[in-house]
Amino acid sequence: MAVARAGVLGVQWLQRASRNVMPLGARTASHMTKDMFPGPYPRTPEERAAAAKKYNMRVEDYEPYPDDGMGYGDYPKLPDRSQHERDPWYSWDQPGLRLNWGEPMHWHLDMYNRNRVDTSPTPVSWHVMCMQLFGFLAFMIFMCWVGDVYPVYQPVGPKQYPYNNLYLERGGDPSKEPERVVHYEI
């Protein structure tokens, strides 16, 4: 009993001590720094200019997300375009994401990167794609109906068996020689 009590006290002491110790540097290095978090929503033109400078944007191009309580702060509202639409032949600093150093990333970059959604315009309009899909489905349903109404079977000849048409297996007399069955003519 005393050993169990000592073990519980040891665990409690270890938990209290670990709260007071600073975390390891490698663990905290993966978190965002204070400068990376968006600041408060800009209310004045000076705050907008400072936020635009913070995100390496021109003041004319800077438009923050609306202050609706979602926590976007002063982060710029970038166009909802995927990375597929960016020039693949440009010499990007990070070619995998097609981003340059210091360029603001889209708030939903995990959704608009090249492995996910492609928002580039399609070469065929939505109406034409729907017409092609439903036209193909209607044609296939029609052909299945035609095949059901007018079945087609392969021509079949009479069944042929080995060993003189299975003479003994069908109850033939073993002492009698059966007539020879010829399945072909030459």
From Swiss-Prot:
Membrane topology: Single-pass membrane protein
Pfam families reported in the protein's UniProt record: NDUF_B8
One CC-aspect GO term: mitochondrial inner membrane
Transit peptide start and end: 1-28
GO molecular function: NADH dehydrogenase (ubiquinone) activity
Main location: mitochondrion
Subcellular location: Mitochondrion inner membrane
Superkingdom in the source lineage: Eukaryota
Keyword annotations: Disease variant, Electron transport, Membrane, Mitochondrion, Mitochondrion inner membrane, Primary mitochondrial disease, Respiratory chain, Transit peptide, Transmembrane, Transmembrane helix, Transport
InterPro entries: NDUFB8, Ndufb8_metazoa
Subunit structure of this chain's protein: Complex I is composed of 45 different subunits.
TM region positions: 133-153
Gene that specifies this protein: NDUFB8
Any one GO biological process: mitochondrial electron transport, NADH to ubiquinone
Protein name: NADH dehydrogenase [ubiquinone] 1 beta subcomplex subunit 8, mitochondrial
Pathological association: Mitochondrial complex I deficiency, nuclear type 32: A form of mitochondrial complex I deficiency, the most common biochemical signature of mitochondrial disorders, a group of highly heterogeneous conditions characterized by defective oxidative phosphorylation, which collectively affects 1 in 5-10000 live births. Clinical disorders have variable severity, ranging from lethal neonatal disease to adult-onset neurodegenerative disorders.
PANTHER family recorded: NADH DEHYDROGENASE [UBIQUINONE] 1 BETA SUBCOMPLEX SUBUNIT 8, MITOCHONDRIAL, NADH-UBIQUINONE OXIDOREDUCTASE ASHI SUBUNIT
Family under the similarity heading: Belongs to the complex I NDUFB8 subunit family.
